Structure formats: C-alpha cells, structure tokens
Amino acid sequence: DAGVSWKVYRNKTLGPISSVLTYGSLVTSFKQSADPRSDLVRFGVAPSYPASFAADVLANRLPRVSWVIPNVLESEHPAVPAAAGAFAIVNILRILLANPAVWEKTALIVSYDENGGFFDHVVPATAPAGTPGEYVTVPDIDQVPGSGGIRGPIGLGFRVPCFVISPYSRGPQMVHDTFDHTSQLRLLETRFGVPVPNLTAWRRSVTGDMTSTFNFAVPPNSSWPNLDYPGLHALSTVPQCVPNAALGTINRGIPYRVPDPQIMPTQETTPTRGIPSGPC
C-alpha cells in the first residue's frame, strides 16, 4: 500500500456484454478476489460504472487514480461501430464536468490496447538483442497455454491512439514523444512519487512519462468543452456492423463493402507541442 487511493469502475448491468467479460476473468485470477473484505474486492470489484463513478464525482470523493472499464458495446472492438466508443467518452466527460471542483484537477486518459489494422509505416523501437528484461527467453514457450509460442523482444508495437483530456491539455494538440502503455505508470510515478519497479532502463530511456502532454505554465482552462455527441451520420455504419455481430465472431468478421470510387485520404494536421516537450 503506497498510500495512493484507487478504484476500478466497471459496468455490471449488461450481462454478458458488460465489463465482466473483459475484466472479470482477470480479477478472479487473484485469490484475494474470493475475500469480500479485501482491498481488491472493495476497490477493484465492488465499484460500478456509471452509478458509483457518478456518485463519487458529485460527492468529490473520486480517488486519486481511477480506471473506468467500458462494456463490450463501448470498446470499439469489431463488429461494434467506433462511434459507440465516442459516445462512451462523451458520457464520462459529462459525469466529470458535473462537478467543476473535480474536473479542474482531473486528467482523463483514453487508451487503446490494439490498433485498427496490421500496418504501421513507423517502425517501433526495439531493444538490442539480449537486453535483460526486454526479451522472452523461456525455453519451450510454445508449450505454455496462451503464449502463442512467441519468443523475442517485448514491444514496442504498432502505434495506438491515446487521448489526454484535462484543463491543462486543452488543444487539440499533438505530442510527438514516444509513449507506451507503461508510460501511464510512469506518469503516476512522477505525480505521486511511487516507483515502478518492473521497468527496464532501456524502456525508461526510450519512452516518456506523459508529463509532456500537459502545460502547467498557463492557468488551467476548465471551461466546458464542446461535447456534442457523434453525429447521426455515424449511425450509418450500424447496418454494416449488424451482419458481423450476427454472423461473424469476435475474431472472424464478414468483409465490409469496399467504397467505390475510392480517393486518397488527406493527412490531418494539428498544432504540436515542442520536442522534447517535458513538463511545463
């Protein structure tokens, strides 16, 4: 116990498509989950979303670190339309904005565990061969259930989206520093002074701690942002998703109709923070 309060909020009301599907099996792997008095159950199982989360925000008792686990319909995993995830993000922000005293000291980090395809023109950083702690070297790993038989470097991988939304990161702006999922742990390490012991020196040298996503040199902009829900045009994708949901599986989808004619996409631009940006 490092003295940093935390909770995991998850949806429990949608049966098989609630957060239990994506999170429940992970928690029950720990023996503490069988004890209703344990901190794991009190803070990692009992809290619900949106009820407990909204109540804690309104009462100004949100813990210092919170995780919100979406239900399957909000996860943007095929065959669910990506617009459903956008609705979920807006709903979380609306809950936070309901209490300005909470919002002015809160940062919402929206993270993804996978990219949207199998191609990235940017080659990820890879640790030199033999770097301790950065290579899987277990013999006969293909005999380990669920391992996929992969031996070699542990990341980095294809790029995935990440949004940092707070009064200190108003933009929109883009940060070009290199982060990975452990960067969120590094941010907590920097903010609360609790060391993360399981990160190698190589990973620390390659990835940042996400402090560069904030600008503390200017007063916070805690005004109400534009939170319009995704346009109704996004619902046009739903008919395309129904066959996948009904006939496909979570790993094997039905091909979508290829638009015709096709045009080359236009690369979007946005203001960027300096490189390296670091804490302001």
UniProtKB/Swiss-Prot annotation:
- Name its species: Mycobacterium tuberculosis (strain ATCC 25618 / H37Rv)
Range of residues in the leader sequence = none
GO BP: any one term: lipid catabolic process
Q: Where in the cell is it found?
A: Secreted, Cell wall
Job of this protein: Involved in virulence. Induces cytotoxic effects on mouse macrophage cell lines, via direct or indirect enzymatic hydrolysis of cell membrane phospholipids. Hydrolyzes phosphatidylcholine. Does not have hemolytic activity.
What is the name attached to this protein's record? Phospholipase C D
Q: Which UniProt keywords apply?
A: Cell wall, Hydrolase, Secreted, Virulence
> Might you report a single GO cellular component term?
extracellular region
* Temperature-activity profile: Optimum temperature is 37 degrees Celsius.
Q: What else is known?
A: Polymorphism was discovered in the phospholipase plcD region.
- The protein's Enzyme Commission number: 3.1.4.3
Recorded catalytic reaction(s): these are:
a 1,2-diacyl-sn-glycero-3-phosphocholine + H2O = phosphocholine + a 1,2-diacyl-sn-glycerol + H(+); 1,2-dihexadecanoyl-sn-glycero-3-phosphocholine + H2O = 1,2-dihexadecanoyl-sn-glycerol + phosphocholine + H(+)
**Does the record's keyword annotation contain Secreted?**
yes
> What does the entry report about how pH modulates activity?
Optimum pH is 7.5.
Q: Which Gene3D superfamilies does the annotation name?
A: Alkaline Phosphatase, subunit A
InterPro entries attached to this UniProt entry: Alkaline_phosphatase_core_sf, Phosphoesterase
Q: Region Disordered: list its residue ranges.
A: 258-280
Query: Which terms in the Gene Ontology molecular function aspect does this entry carry?
Result: phosphatidylcholine phospholipase C activity
Q: Give the primary localization class.
A: secreted
Checking Pfam families in the record gives:
Phosphoesterase
Task: Describe the family membership recorded for this protein in Swiss-Prot or TrEMBL.
Answer: Belongs to the bacterial phospholipase C family.
Q: Secreted as a keyword?
A: yes
